[in-house]
């Protein structure tokens, strides 16, 4: 797909890029090359290839879904100036 300077200028405007006039011809050639490569990729037969979301075949380890208290309450409350019944105790700010 061959792009001309007018199309490159329109793309630059849409992308909010300020491209100097003397660079338009070179960019038109580079973008045309990129689009030609994409067209080649579109021609590849992928009918026998399974769809994938990542190139790495990763699987997460499953664990039992159980509710716990986390075991951090004592360590977290140790940072509080004051605590009461397992909660932070803060000064009253509203009368």
Swiss-Prot record:
InterPro entries: Asp/Glu-ADT_sf_sub_c (IPR036113), GatC (IPR003837). GO terms for biological process: glutaminyl-tRNAGln biosynthesis via transamidation; regulation of translational fidelity; translation. Its EC number is 6.3.5.-. The keyword Ligase applies. Keywords: ATP-binding, Ligase, Nucleotide-binding, Protein biosynthesis. It catalyses: L-glutamyl-tRNA(Gln) + L-glutamine + ATP + H2O = L-glutaminyl-tRNA(Gln) + L-glutamate + ADP + phosphate + H(+); L-aspartyl-tRNA(Asn) + L-glutamine + ATP + H2O = L-asparaginyl-tRNA(Asn) + L-glutamate + ADP + phosphate + 2 H(+). It is an enzyme of class 6 (ligase). It holds the Pfam family GatC. GO terms for molecular function: asparaginyl-tRNA synthase (glutamine-hydrolyzing) activity; ATP binding; glutaminyl-tRNA synthase (glutamine-hydrolyzing) activity. Heterotrimer of A, B and C subunits. NCBIfam families: gatC. Belongs to the GatC family. Allows the formation of correctly charged Asn-tRNA(Asn) or Gln-tRNA(Gln) through the transamidation of misacylated Asp-tRNA(Asn) or Glu-tRNA(Gln) in organisms which lack either or both of asparaginyl-tRNA or glutaminyl-tRNA synthetases. The reaction takes place in the presence of glutamine and ATP through an activated phospho-Asp-tRNA(Asn) or phospho-Glu-tRNA(Gln). PANTHER family: GLUTAMYL-TRNA(GLN) AMIDOTRANSFERASE SUBUNIT C, MITOCHONDRIAL. This is Aspartyl/glutamyl-tRNA(Asn/Gln) amidotransferase subunit C. It comes from Rhodospirillum rubrum (strain ATCC 11170 / ATH 1.1.1 / DSM 467 / LMG 4362 / NCIMB 8255 / S1).
